[in-house]
């Protein structure tokens, strides 16, 4: 059975064209800095984002870990959102491995951190407190795009306090496509950026961490320390390069399908769904009955998968097509008896 898998854009699979690029990738030893594919990907990624250097790593979790540990010494602190991926879904690696104190502040509905909350969370220059060194933002967060004026305001705030600013940009290019801004514009306020290649962009493995030469040199040493040094990684890097060059513009199709799905579901009885919150490739909804387990079982029996932890999440991606959207709407209609 072919599943319509809307659980996440992490389930994307390489296209035939991407597989051909991987098949013919030239490789070397990346720990020695001799893999042509990795070197090409890192150079392309750094230039694309307007930064000095980049580092290819196996995962977004590792990329964020290296970023926090490169910015902060042991015993220093980072301010971030209470619902941020770094804080909630990365096993507190920055604290466990880096001894960095993570200071959460409330996350707003649009994925932002209130400037007043961040300012209040910055530790005073006093021996009783952990020195704050870093602020982390996430764009997109739950499919929502942080506005460029807000990013610039946050840059001004961190500059006032002599801090660094990191972006978890796992789905950064969704924000680029949705906002109409260039990627350089969206990342200009940040000292470092993590981008995921294996979500909507469709590569099988990997993330890029970008920043200054000095920052990436520190991150490269830490990558080796935590086991992220790879050898003939050009096969994977070639897929990432293909993704950045070929799959960014097509993210608009994912957004269009998410909107089509959201509008179809919002019209059904028994569903609570705020269309204003559907900005990229994620649709969040609730059943007015409050009981999602029977729905998930019903859908799975029909070859449809999505996440349901209280609020239901459906994510469009490279392997979701127009016919799939119609099939999902029809299945919801049947289940709800509409």
From Swiss-Prot:
Its cofactor is pyridoxal 5'-phosphate. Changing residue 224 to A: No loss of activity. The modification N6-(pyridoxal phosphate)lysine is found at residue 199. SUPFAM superfamilies: PLP-dependent transferases. It comes from the Bacteria. The keyword Magnesium does not apply. GO terms for molecular function: L-allo-threonine aldolase activity. Keywords: Lyase, Pyridoxal phosphate. Changing residue 51 to A: No loss of activity. It catalyses: L-allo-threonine = acetaldehyde + glycine. Its EC number is 4.1.2.49. Homotetramer. PANTHER family: L-THREONINE ALDOLASE, L-THREONINE ALDOLASE-RELATED. Belongs to the threonine aldolase family. NCBIfam families: GntG_guanitoxin (NF041359), PRK10534.1 (NF007825). This is L-allo-threonine aldolase. It comes from Aeromonas jandaei. The lineage of its organism: Bacteria, Pseudomonadati, Pseudomonadota, Gammaproteobacteria, Aeromonadales. The gene is ltaA.
């Amino acid at each position: 059975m072919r599943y319509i898998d809307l659980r996440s854009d992490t389930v994307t699979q390489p296209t035939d064209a991407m597989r051909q690029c991987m098949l013919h990738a030239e490789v070397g030893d990346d720990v020695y800095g001799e893999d042509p594919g990795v070197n090409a990907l890192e150079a392309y990624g750094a230039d694309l984002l307007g930064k000095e250097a980049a580092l290819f790593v196996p995962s977004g979790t590792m990329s964020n870990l290296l970023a926090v540990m490169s910015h902060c010494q042991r015993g220093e602190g980072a301010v971030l959102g209470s619902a941020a991926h770094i804080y909630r879904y990365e096993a507190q690696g920055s604290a466990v491995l880096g001894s960095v104190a993570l200071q959460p502040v409330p996350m707003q509905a649009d994925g932002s951190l209130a400037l007043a909350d961040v300012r209040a969370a910055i530790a005073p220059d006093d021996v009783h407190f952990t020195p704050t060194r870093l602020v982390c933002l996430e764009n997109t967060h739950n499919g929502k795009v942080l506005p460029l004026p807000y990013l610039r305001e946050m840059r001004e705030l961190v500059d006032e306090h002599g801090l660094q600013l990191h972006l978890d940009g796992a789905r950064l290019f969704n924000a680029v496509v949705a906002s109409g801004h260039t990627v350089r514009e969206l990342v200009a306020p940040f000292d470092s950026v993590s981008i995921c290649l294996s979500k909507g962009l469709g590569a099988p493995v990997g993330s890029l961490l970008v920043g200054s030469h000095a920052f990436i040199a520190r991150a490269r040493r830490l990558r080796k320390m935590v086991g992220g040094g790879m050898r003939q990684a050009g096969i994977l890097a070639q897929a990432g390069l293909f993704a950045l060059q070929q799959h960014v513009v097509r993210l608009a199709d994912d957004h269009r399908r998410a909107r089509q799905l959201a509008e179809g579901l919002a019209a059904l009885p028994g569903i609570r769904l705020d269309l204003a919150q559907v900005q990229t490739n994620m649709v969040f909804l609730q059943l007015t009955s409050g009981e999602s387990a029977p729905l998930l079982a019903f859908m799975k029996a029909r070859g449809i998968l999505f996440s349901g932890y209280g609020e239901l999440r459906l994510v469009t991606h490279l392997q979701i097509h127009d016919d799939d959207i119609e099939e999902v709407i029809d299945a919801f209609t049947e289940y709800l008896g509409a």
